[in-house]
Amino acid sequence: MQNLYSEDDTRVKFIDAKLYDSSWNEENIKRNYYFTDGRKLLGGKRAQRKFADYLLRYEGNNLAIIEAKKFSKDPLDGLSQGIEYAKILNVPFVYSSNGEKIYEYDIRNHSGKYIDKFPSPKELFDRIYGNVKEWQYKLLTQNVMYIPQKELRYYQKIAIDKVIEAIINNKNRILLTLATGTGKTTIAFNLCYRLLEARWNKENKDQKPKILFLCDRVSLRDQALGEFNPIESDCKAISAEEIKKNDGKIITNANIFFGIYQSLAANSKEQENIQEEQESKFYLQYPKDFFDLIIIDECHRGGANEEGSWRAVLEYFSYATQLGLTATPKKEENIDTYEYFGESVYDYSLKSGIEDGFLTPYKVKLIKTTLSDGYTYNPDDLIQGELEKGFYKQSEFERNIFLPNYNDFIAKKILELINPMDKTIIFCVNQAHANEVKRAIDKYKSVKRDDYCVRVTSDEGKIGLDYLKLFQDNDKSYPVILTSSKMLTTGVDAKNVRNIVLLANIGSMVEFKQIIGRGTRVYEGKDFFTILDFVGATKLFYDPKWDGEKIEELKEQDEKEKITKEHIKQTKEESKEKKSVTIHLKGTKLKVLDITTTYVGAQGKPLSTKEFLEFLIGKLGEYYDDEAKLREIWSDQKNRERFLKALANDGVDENALKDLREIFSKRL
């Protein structure tokens, strides 16, 4: 009789009944809780989504998951998967049940036991959080705002919960590290909403808190304001315009204030313009204990060292709890950020985002040309200016050595490698180089429109920002290609970017991740994006914990990265001293020597073509022992489709599956 009960029968007849007996109601039970979207595959397909059979919740808090097995199975059969999912979802308890027996596993102390009945929601909540004060309970049980079609992703909820836990534990400096494109502003909005609704503040008064949201650019501040639109009545921008409206007095009649920190520390190199310098000084007019919480967006950019842009702001408002948001993991060049805030309370990596299907996977085309390493003096070339015989490194290009022919050659190659209407961002050495590349693109473009390729740099001002808005609008086809230098490394929310082109040496892991983040956002019909690397930057900046394991030739990355940063710094200093030289290539031949395509595997690991084939062969070996077994699988249509689906879930894309079909059809 027991064998007649399927897993669904077991859930309905036995597990649900036991939950009801322990005071669990439908509001607290989520069945078949899917928490990932499944890695994006070619052809608009996705790998299998991860889900828990049951998620148990109470007062907005995820407390436990249940893995259900059919009545005739051993309840422990589902435990390992349950533990894996519970760790991902940050829930402390796992239950595995066949309807008759219940096994409870406590992840916090790595121990388990059989129990007679499920604990009630309140019992489980108290076991996790213990005795909490009234204000702490309010914070823990305050839900986020319900917005239809915008339910929080699992990692966004965890990030918010981790910050709430840190606040409850009186931690004054908090850091969140989440990859670009994962919705840090969404997290900030929902966190602020919970704090406002729970009426949390540093003095435990019955009033809403005062929160300052800091950005380093006016455009990013305005973008954040847009995200907070559902509670716009609580929000105000600290700006010259708003203060002018307020008869020259600082704005105090709000709960969430948005501003920029760009030049408070008088770091003139980081000032975008005089307006931003003036706006940032308005902070000094607020009392030091005015704010309860300060959120610093992209905190790796301002710098936590004593001369950093936001350091002075935070020291002035040291009374406030301070939350830093960053997209970059701990590395040498942003160590000050981590020393200031401490270790991140929660990390969500690019690798995880791609595996879960919330970020778009990518492939890299490393293009090696005759000038990839540098230029060797050739008397047959037309040289304008003084140039000694010798070898000049590629990092000197467009600083004091100008090669118009080479820019033409690169532009032509870019247009050959991309689809003409695929949105593309080209990162150049500087603003002048961005202008030169635009000129070269215009020379060879097949689409004859003035706005097909545009330059977006700080020199372009409002015109450039208007072009950027059009580029980010998914309903607009033009502009298609943007050329820029540093301006577009952050703050570009363009979901349909298909190509990132690297024409400039990159000096740090932080900058590299910011640039790559321009392409990772998910968009309908976008199965992957492509990095076209003309300078070898992708060889230097793979990060095993963040992006996946290193391939063999990248193992000297740390030393190379250090050398690269030092070399770029040295090159910039030398360029200031040297006179510029323009070289019209007459004798030097321009050609592509090699294009190496690197795939990114299901686990985020970068794979060369050879390694990708080895990966396929290895995957095949997991499903059959010999050729006879493969013939047996392939001869049955249902088995064949199951086999191909299993391969797809392991990250084998449709093109590879098509090749496999052809190979098998000929061979079998």
Predicted regions and their residues:
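Conserved ATPase-coupling elements of RecA-like P-loop NTPase cores
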Residues: 224, 268-271, 299-310, 492-495
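Conserved RecA-like P-loop NTPase helicase motor core
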Residues: 71-72, 262-265, 300-301, 453-555
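Interdomain helical connector at the RecA1-RecA2 junction of SF1/SF2 helicase-like NTPases
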Residues: 335-422, 438
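Long, largely alpha-helical accessory region at the distal end of helicase-like NTP-driven motors
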Residues: 146-149, 162-163, 395-402, 406, ...
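ATP-dependent helicase/translocase motor core
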Residues: 1-210, 215, 219, 223-234, ...
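Conserved C-terminal RecA-like helicase domain
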Residues: 255, 393-483
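SF2 helicase catalytic motif II
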Residues: 281-324
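Conserved RecA-like helicase motor-core motifs
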Residues: 26-31, 232-246, 445-462
